[in-house]
């Protein structure tokens, strides 16, 4: 299959082409499309017009993502959105190519402004082309699209907010109560790739992305600002919420390189170190413990607190004893055969580094974040 993508270097185009390349190269096998049969033609505003002629002669499917969003003069809307679509369709007709054609429109096509009028004209042109040639056409009226690689301080509020907050730049919100309808770029790309196989989602004359998120402008800003504070608190978002998960990924894509990493507080003593990595309100705390050769750590028990230990490097011994009894349960552990050892409430426990030369590195999960006011930790040797 030969696929033509116009506007290939735009926001949606770049993401679509990237995933089509993954399919072609055998890296994305979840779409049911034979990648070795794909040829991808990329066309953009600075491409040679002769290339468009060649591509339109050979294409088996066309994604027309080219368009103008923010010209210097309003008259350019019609030229960029209607004019190019007309050129594209005329070129297909010249070669008698009636392959399916998808066009990227906007929910603003219903509005009476220069942008909406140009999009609506492009839609009607495509519908007329279908009636004239019998070609299958797919008109997608996208709401606001967000995700990685979207240009900030241009037409996308989400991209601007993510970029500016990530860079500690000011933002302006005129009305935080404005309701936004958004689709995520990965959902858009998945829908467009489904359309290749005739599995598009239709709603009357139009096609649509089935997953739409609705949230106020103020809610978006509040979430992004919370993301900015998370490295300092070691927290992570509520990823059970689909929109939050997608917005967090989008926010991270705008981080300046100097914020790709951030320091952790290592609690160091002569026995080794203990370092918290992630703290959550409902999934506990994740930490790394390092014990020096021959060192024993722990020797305490908890009423409610429970933990999971995984030795990832070194050779150690984990021991547990139920309070009020003398029987000791022992687990010899090492990084070459990882396993989870549960620290059970009501059992005093320790972890011993059996090596004389190597550190013992243990990944630890605890069901609650440490609270110095209620540590629930009581010393007692195993």
Residue ranges and their predicted role:
Residues 1-26:
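N-terminal Rossmann NAD(P)H-binding glycine-rich loop of SDR-like oxidoreductase domains
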Residues 45-83, 87, 91-95, 108-111:
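NAD(P)H-binding glycine-rich loop region in Rossmannoid oxidoreductase-like domains
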Residues 86-123, 130-133, 138-140:
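Conserved Rossmann-fold NAD(P)-dependent oxidoreductase catalytic core, especially the SDR/UDP-sugar
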Residues 124-149, 162-163, 169-178:
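Conserved beta-loop-beta element that borders a ligand/cofactor-binding pocket
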Residues 152-160, 177-197, 218-222:
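Substrate-positioning beta->alpha
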Residues 194, 198-265:
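Mid/C-terminal beta-alpha module of Rossmann-like enzyme folds, strongest
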Residues 260-299, 305:
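A short glycine-rich, His/Asp/Glu-containing loop-to-beta-strand
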Residues 325-327, 352-382:
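Double-stranded beta-helix
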């Amino acid at each position: 299959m030969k696929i033509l993508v116009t506007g290939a270097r735009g926001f949606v185009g770049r993401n679509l082409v990237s995933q089509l390349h993954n399919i072609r190269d055998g890296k994305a096998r979840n779409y049911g499309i034979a990648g070795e049969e794909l040829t991808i033609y990329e066309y953009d505003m600075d491409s040679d017009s002769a290339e468009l002629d060649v591509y339109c002669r050979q294409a088996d499917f066309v994604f027309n993502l080219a368009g103008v969003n923010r010209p210097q003069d309003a008259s350019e809307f019609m030229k960029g959105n209607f004019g190019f679509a007309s050129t594209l369709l005329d070129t297909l007709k010249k070669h008698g190519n009636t392959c399916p054609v998808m066009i990227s429109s906007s929910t603003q096509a219903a509005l009476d402004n220069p942008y909406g009028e140009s999009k609506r004209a492009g839609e009607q042109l495509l519908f007329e082309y279908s009636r004239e040639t019998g070609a299958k056409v797919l008109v997608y009226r996208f709401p606001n699209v967000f995700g990685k690689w979207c240009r900030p301080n241009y037409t996308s509020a989400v991209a601007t907010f993510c970029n500016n907050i990530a860079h500690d730049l000011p933002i302006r919100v005129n009305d935080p109560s404005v309701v936004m309808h958004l689709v995520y770029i990965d959902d858009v790309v998945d829908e467009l790739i489904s359309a290749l196989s005739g599995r598009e989602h239709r709603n009357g004359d139009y096609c649509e992305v089935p997953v739409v998120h609705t949230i106020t402008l103020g809610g978006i800003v509040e979430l992004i600002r919370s993301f900015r504070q998370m490295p300092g608190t070691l927290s992570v978002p509520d990823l059970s919420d689909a929109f939050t998960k997608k917005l967090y990924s989008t926010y991270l894509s705008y981080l300046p390189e100097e914020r790709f990493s951030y320091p952790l507080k290592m609690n160091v003593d002569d026995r080794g170190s203990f370092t918290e990595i992630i703290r959550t309100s409902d999934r506990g705390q994740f930490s790394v413990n390092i014990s020096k050769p021959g060192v024993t750590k722990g020797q305490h028990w908890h009423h409610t607190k429970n933990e999971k230990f995984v030795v990832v490097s070194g050779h150690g011994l984990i021991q547990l004893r139920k309070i009020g009894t003398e029987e000791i349960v022992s687990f010899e552990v090492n990084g070459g055969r990882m396993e989870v050892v549960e620290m059970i409430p009501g059992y005093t426990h320790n972890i011993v580094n059996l090596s004389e030369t190597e550190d013992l590195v243990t990944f630890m999960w605890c069901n609650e974040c440490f609270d110095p006011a209620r540590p629930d930790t009581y010393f007692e040797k195993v």
